[in-house]
Amino acid sequence: MSDVTATQSFYGRWARLYDWVATAPGVESWRVRAAEALALDPGDAVVEMGCGTGANFPHLRERVGPEGTVVGVDLTRGMLRRARERVERAGWENVHVVQADATRPPLPGPVDAVLATFVVGMFADPRPAVRSWVDALAPGGRVALLNAGRSERRFATPLNLAFRGFVRAVAPGKGSVSPARALERRVATARDEVRSQCPTTEFETFGLGYLGLLRGERGAGPESGPGHPTATDAVATEPTRTQ
């Protein structure tokens, strides 16, 4: 079974439970934080990659208003079914759901922002996907990645063991590599790609150090794009906040 097929099967089977967890009060606050990182204005166009059941839609729609546009992209039918139900219940005419591969999103033109929450860890190599997301941004556009990982705080050693067990339990498919290690490697690679593509980035951790939120802004002039600045330069100048 391919990684894509395994992911579709897993999340399609657990869509109802996923939606319940994704909208739990504590998790909801994480999603608000991610939406705020995009600094959306009324009328903006924002695309969510791997939108799942649409748990982020209310926060994105609230910020772009009725004159803006929200597009959710996901590959799993079960997830999208619940996302469409959420849109229909709310009566949002400017929120759209598209079944497509988030690594190759069918975007017709530049957008103001791209959001991906707990998504890049599913990609064997997230670099091409992240690069395409940044390329889809208009000058000055923002991208935000929210992901979970082991905490580096001193008290977290026993909790990290529980975290690794949780990741193994919820990982679609089974492989020889530790799911927790694979997740960490993929998330780090995705963050490095954002830093290499965006002149300005900000990173913060919260949730006892288990959650990391990276925000990147595409350059407004001809200097935007690959190679400006290098990943090393971006990391050196990146403001880092912890909570």
Residue ranges with predicted function:
Residues 65, 123-124, 137-138:
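Helix-to-beta-strand junctions that scaffold the AdoMet/dcAdoMet cofactor pocket
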Residues 103-114:
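A short acidic, Gly/Pro-enriched loop at the edge of an enzyme's catalytic core
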Residues 113-126:
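A short SAM/SAH-binding and catalytic strip from SAM-dependent methyltransferases
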Residues 24, 146-212:
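C-terminal alpha-helical "lid/dimerization" subdomain adjacent to the S-adenosyl-L-methionine
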Residues 47-49, 53-104:
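Class I SAM-dependent methyltransferase SAM/SAH-binding core
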Residues 127-139:
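A short glycine-rich, Lys/Arg-flanked "PGG" loop and its adjoining helix->strand segment in the class I
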Residues 1-39, 55-59, 82, 157-167:
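Conserved class I S-adenosyl-L-methionine
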Residues 192-229, 233, 238-243:
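Core SAM-dependent methyltransferase catalytic element
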